[in-house]
């Protein structure tokens, strides 16, 4: 009887002891394993990297204008504003800069700007309708 019980017990426990394929997974991502650990490894490497490329320019190619450039632009804006104010009284105007020649005129209630590029000689005409002949104060 004992032998029968032992055989039955062995038959019951034998499915639990069937062998399967062994699979190994790395627990430490520094030694490989899951490809999802790539961002972790890249961040770790970048945190340890102290090399600075001497040719690297961090300003993205944007040049900040100098104080003289800002002043020149402000003066040109003031002069152009004055010309646009005088156009209401019927006085045409001209502004000459290093790059452009701007002619402003009132043609039958239309503001007409002729802009000539001094480097290429190309001319653009801008016409704005609805010009008021009398200025209003706000």
From Swiss-Prot:
InterPro entries named in the record: T8SS_CsgF
Cleaved signal peptide residues: 1-19
One Pfam family matching this protein: CsgF
Keyword Signal: yes
Keyword hit for Phosphoprotein: no
Keywords: Signal
Described function: May be involved in the biogenesis of curli organelles.
Name this polypeptide is given: Curli production assembly/transport component CsgF
Record organism: Salmonella typhimurium (strain LT2 / SGSC1412 / ATCC 700720)
């Amino acid at each position: 009887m004992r032998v029968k019980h032992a055989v039955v017990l062995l038959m019951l426990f034998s499915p639990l002891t069937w062998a399967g394929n062994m699979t190994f997974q790395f627990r430490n991502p520094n030694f490989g394993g899951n490809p999802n650990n790539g961002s972790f490894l890249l961040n770790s490497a970048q945190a340890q990297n102290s090399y600075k490329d001497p040719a690297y320019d961090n300003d993205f190619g944007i040049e900040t204008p100098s104080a003289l450039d800002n002043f020149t632009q402000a003066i040109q804006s003031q002069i152009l504003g004055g010309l646009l104010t005088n156009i209401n009284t019927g006085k045409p105007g001209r502004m000459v800069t290093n790059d452009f020649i701007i002619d402003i005129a009132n043609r039958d209630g239309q503001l007409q700007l002729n802009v000539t590029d001094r480097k290429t000689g190309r001319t653009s005409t801008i016409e704005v309708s609805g010009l008021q002949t009398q200025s209003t104060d706000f």
